[in-house]
């Protein structure tokens, strides 16, 4: 083995170093200021401890706090400090696992008395003391026997179980920070002092060990950490905004929907909420029709044999709702399942009747009700449910048509998002996973086509970010994932485009090619909203309940100041309704400020106020949600203006084009 390694620097230059040299020494050899800023280093993208020897040649990167990758290290190290603080303050508490998660970290603890929110300030204070000690992170590699013995002697039974679960031949790494240590894969920064003070413990929750309800209940402490105070405060402000916009609270205030114990994870839509849902369906239906889709509908309940053929029974059975019918009146004991997906049903429709290459592409769309079992702890309002509606579509095409169809789908997806005000979109290509069906040659062709499509999208759209997710594709083909950013900076993965060579083959779907031979079609799975319930939840939070006029379930309230205006208010409401607007009248004997405040809480976009004077002059006072201003105008002028504003964006484009 060579004693030297060749390292390529970011500027392209290549230098040789002794293989035993550490990352810290290398950083110092470049400059002392860089050595002070360094928190880790990477070779060929693999992040390593500064104390690790270089070992191998490759592309070198010195990671500082400003590097996005440093954030994971900061959060990882903070989780370790949290665990040390807890054990200092509460002797006898067992530590289990403490991973980095999106926007922060958590650590699970086993303790007879669960932690409460009141404990968090005390723990935070101790954490800051530990960080101030600036103890170095040092790594040791232990034998399995030593690790089990040490943790067993400390009464850490969960750590012993974790040691047992580590595959044979894999190093057992132990990281020290002063005298305290933990089992960990690493990497870590150089010392606790590099963490800084830009962290906060957020909440406590219960969590079963290994996520299994048969195991003991642990206490999970969640926290977050950032590289600086500005980022931390921005995140905390975003959380405050998110709480104000929580669709569950707004759903109650706006009287849109509710959930109840008898139907966990399924939505009870109220009249206003269902109107909003239907607005979304109507909009999507028009968009699909204009893009050549045929809307279909497939059964909710199907025999398990179909799911066995599709592969869902083997891959997805535990997440499916099974249906059996037993009793004297039944003549069989067949097992059925509520459909978790619409795709097998669409293949059946494609197979019904002979198809020619001249018929392709065939685009089948469905607003399909599907059911998937989700653990009760994972359910979250409209965002995570057990029963939902997919805006599902499947395009059956030739391999040669695949690129053009993916581009057509992309144009439609981006157009829909833009109509709802989402301009910042990220598209990522997920490539072949380790477990997959189909030959490498087939995957090569599919990924090549989708890489070309992604490049075309990147060139056509300056505001679209793109990326690659290696190994994250579906088992049957590569896919695009569309992520949109909302009004407060949160990202939501919604749309997907997935290429599938597997399902048509499983079901024996074919078309007759130009050579009169049977050919297997490519099947492209496509969703824009994904779950329409979830998309509505995203919209409610994005707009904080203040929906665009064209989408609002109640667009206008006609409210009276005095009973002298009741008849005029009814007349005005009738004209507004005749013009196609969603209108409610409020003739109650209440003060107008009370009425305005109440309808504002329900996020009604426009309130038309009528008093005796307005009734005599055939005018209205228009008030907009979120504004204290009011504008007087004739009723006809108000109708004309509101009808223009209430025209859905797709219909407005058609109107303007005409």
Swiss-Prot record:
Q: Where does Zn(2+) bind?
A: 343, 394, 525
From what superkingdom does this record's organism come?
Bacteria
The TGS domain sits at 1-64
- Region of interest (Catalytic), residue spans: 246-548
GO MF terms on file? ATP binding; metal ion binding; threonine-tRNA ligase activity; tRNA binding
**SMART domains, per this entry?**
tRNA_SAD (SM00863)
Family membership, please give it: Belongs to the class-II aminoacyl-tRNA synthetase family.
Quaternary structure and partners: Homodimer.
* Protein name as it appears in the record: Threonine--tRNA ligase
